[in-house]
Protein backbone atom coordinates (compact mmCIF):
# COMPACT_ATOMS: atom_id res chain seq x y z
CA UNK A 1 0.00 0.00 0.00
CA UNK A 2 1.23 3.46 -0.87
CA UNK A 3 0.35 6.52 1.21
CA UNK A 4 0.07 9.86 -0.54
CA UNK A 5 -0.16 13.27 1.05
CA UNK A 6 -1.68 15.61 -1.51
CA UNK A 7 -1.22 19.11 -0.16
CA UNK A 8 -1.95 22.62 -1.38
CA UNK A 9 1.16 24.78 -1.35
CA UNK A 10 4.66 24.70 -2.77
CA UNK A 11 7.99 26.25 -1.82
CA UNK A 12 7.89 25.31 1.84
CA UNK A 13 10.52 26.55 4.29
CA UNK A 14 13.63 24.38 4.56
CA UNK A 15 12.69 23.14 8.06
CA UNK A 16 9.40 21.78 6.67
CA UNK A 17 11.12 19.95 3.83
CA UNK A 18 13.74 18.51 6.18
CA UNK A 19 11.17 17.48 8.80
CA UNK A 20 8.95 15.81 6.22
CA UNK A 21 11.89 14.00 4.59
CA UNK A 22 13.15 12.77 7.98
CA UNK A 23 9.95 10.81 8.55
CA UNK A 24 9.06 9.88 4.96
CA UNK A 25 12.45 8.19 4.45
CA UNK A 26 11.79 5.91 7.45
CA UNK A 27 8.77 4.22 5.89
CA UNK A 28 9.28 0.66 4.66
CA UNK A 29 9.52 0.01 0.92
CA UNK A 30 6.15 -1.76 0.93
CA UNK A 31 4.44 1.36 2.36
CA UNK A 32 6.11 4.46 0.92
CA UNK A 33 4.90 7.93 1.86
CA UNK A 34 4.74 10.28 -1.12
CA UNK A 35 4.11 14.03 -1.07
CA UNK A 36 2.34 15.65 -4.01
CA UNK A 37 2.24 19.44 -3.91
CA UNK A 38 -0.55 21.39 -5.59
CA UNK A 39 0.13 25.06 -6.36
CA UNK A 40 -2.04 27.34 -4.24
CA UNK A 41 -4.40 29.67 -6.07
CA UNK A 42 -3.48 33.33 -6.04
CA UNK A 43 -5.07 35.02 -3.08
CA UNK A 44 -5.49 38.74 -2.90
CA UNK A 45 -7.74 41.37 -1.44
CA UNK A 46 -10.67 40.64 -3.78
CA UNK A 47 -9.93 36.98 -4.51
CA UNK A 48 -12.82 34.68 -5.40
CA UNK A 49 -12.16 32.12 -2.67
CA UNK A 50 -14.88 29.73 -3.85
CA UNK A 51 -13.29 29.65 -7.32
CA UNK A 52 -9.79 29.18 -5.84
CA UNK A 53 -11.02 26.26 -3.70
CA UNK A 54 -12.72 24.72 -6.74
CA UNK A 55 -9.53 24.91 -8.85
CA UNK A 56 -7.34 23.58 -6.03
CA UNK A 57 -9.83 20.76 -5.45
CA UNK A 58 -9.89 19.84 -9.13
CA UNK A 59 -6.09 19.73 -9.19
CA UNK A 60 -5.98 17.60 -6.03
CA UNK A 61 -8.55 15.10 -7.27
CA UNK A 62 -6.80 14.88 -10.66
CA UNK A 63 -3.68 13.51 -8.92
CA UNK A 64 -5.57 10.73 -7.12
CA UNK A 65 -5.20 7.41 -8.94
CA UNK A 66 -8.43 5.64 -9.80
CA UNK A 67 -9.46 3.32 -7.00
CA UNK A 68 -7.47 5.03 -4.24
CA UNK A 69 -9.12 5.53 -0.87
CA UNK A 70 -9.51 9.27 -0.32
CA UNK A 71 -9.16 10.63 3.21
CA UNK A 72 -9.56 14.35 3.85
CA UNK A 73 -7.87 16.26 6.62
CA UNK A 74 -10.63 18.46 8.02
CA UNK A 75 -11.39 19.98 11.44
CA UNK A 76 -14.87 18.35 11.70
CA UNK A 77 -13.39 14.95 10.79
CA UNK A 78 -12.86 12.06 13.17
CA UNK A 79 -10.04 12.38 15.71
CA UNK A 80 -7.76 9.38 16.11
CA UNK A 81 -5.18 8.83 18.81
CA UNK A 82 -2.04 6.89 17.87
CA UNK A 83 -3.61 3.49 18.57
CA UNK A 84 -6.70 4.33 16.55
CA UNK A 85 -4.59 5.63 13.67
CA UNK A 86 -2.58 2.38 13.76
CA UNK A 87 -5.88 0.47 13.52
CA UNK A 88 -6.88 2.64 10.56
CA UNK A 89 -3.55 1.91 8.88
CA UNK A 90 -4.11 -1.83 9.35
CA UNK A 91 -7.64 -1.50 8.00
CA UNK A 92 -6.38 0.42 4.96
CA UNK A 93 -3.73 -2.27 4.32
CA UNK A 94 -6.37 -5.01 4.45
CA UNK A 95 -8.49 -3.01 2.00
CA UNK A 96 -5.68 -3.43 -0.53
CA UNK A 97 -5.87 0.06 -2.03
CA UNK A 98 -3.48 2.97 -1.94
CA UNK A 99 -4.52 5.89 0.28
CA UNK A 100 -4.57 9.54 -0.76
CA UNK A 101 -4.80 12.02 2.11
CA UNK A 102 -5.92 15.50 1.01
CA UNK A 103 -4.62 18.56 2.86
CA UNK A 104 -6.28 21.81 1.81
CA UNK A 105 -4.93 25.32 1.71
CA UNK A 106 -5.65 28.23 4.07
CA UNK A 107 -9.41 28.04 3.48
CA UNK A 108 -9.56 24.26 3.62
CA UNK A 109 -10.87 21.85 1.01
CA UNK A 110 -13.35 22.21 -1.82
CA UNK A 111 -16.81 20.68 -1.52
CA UNK A 112 -15.81 18.24 -4.31
CA UNK A 113 -12.86 16.95 -2.26
CA UNK A 114 -15.05 16.49 0.80
CA UNK A 115 -17.68 14.67 -1.27
CA UNK A 116 -15.08 12.31 -2.79
CA UNK A 117 -13.70 11.29 0.61
CA UNK A 118 -14.44 7.94 2.18
CA UNK A 119 -13.13 9.21 5.50
CA UNK A 120 -12.42 12.56 7.11
CA UNK A 121 -9.68 12.87 9.71
CA UNK A 122 -9.27 15.73 12.17
CA UNK A 123 -5.65 16.05 13.16
CA UNK A 124 -6.47 18.49 15.96
CA UNK A 125 -9.13 20.94 17.07
CA UNK A 126 -6.35 23.54 16.88
CA UNK A 127 -5.75 25.54 13.74
CA UNK A 128 -2.27 24.57 12.59
CA UNK A 129 -0.13 26.25 9.93
CA UNK A 130 -0.27 24.18 6.76
CA UNK A 131 3.51 23.75 6.48
CA UNK A 132 3.63 22.27 9.99
CA UNK A 133 0.79 19.86 9.18
CA UNK A 134 2.98 18.06 6.63
CA UNK A 135 5.60 17.30 9.26
CA UNK A 136 3.02 16.29 11.89
CA UNK A 137 1.24 14.04 9.36
CA UNK A 138 4.46 12.30 8.32
CA UNK A 139 5.45 11.70 11.95
CA UNK A 140 1.95 10.55 12.97
CA UNK A 141 1.70 8.10 10.09
CA UNK A 142 5.21 6.80 10.76
CA UNK A 143 4.39 6.37 14.46
CA UNK A 144 1.19 4.50 13.56
CA UNK A 145 3.17 2.24 11.22
CA UNK A 146 5.69 1.59 14.02
CA UNK A 147 2.84 0.43 16.27
CA UNK A 148 1.54 -1.97 13.60
CA UNK A 149 5.05 -3.32 12.96
CA UNK A 150 6.02 -3.63 16.65
CA UNK A 151 8.88 -1.26 15.93
CA UNK A 152 10.45 0.32 19.04
CA UNK A 153 9.88 3.93 17.83
CA UNK A 154 6.56 4.22 19.69
CA UNK A 155 6.50 3.69 23.44
CA UNK A 156 3.37 3.52 25.58
Swiss-Prot record:
SUPFAM superfamilies listed in its UniProt record: alpha/beta knot
The protein's Enzyme Commission number: 2.1.1.177
Top EC category: transferase
GO cellular component: cytoplasm
Self-association state and partner proteins as the record states: Homodimer.
Family annotation (NCBIfam families): PRK00103.1-1, PRK00103.1-4, tRNA_RlmH_YbeA
HAMAP family: 23SrRNA_methyltr_H
Function recorded in the entry: Specifically methylates the pseudouridine at position 1915 (m3Psi1915) in 23S rRNA.
Name of the protein this chain belongs to: Ribosomal RNA large subunit methyltransferase H
Amino acid sequence: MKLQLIAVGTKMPKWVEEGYKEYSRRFPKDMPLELIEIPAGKRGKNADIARILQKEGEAMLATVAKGNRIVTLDIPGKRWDTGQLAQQLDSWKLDGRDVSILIGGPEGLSPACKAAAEQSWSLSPLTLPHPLVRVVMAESLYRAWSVTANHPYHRE
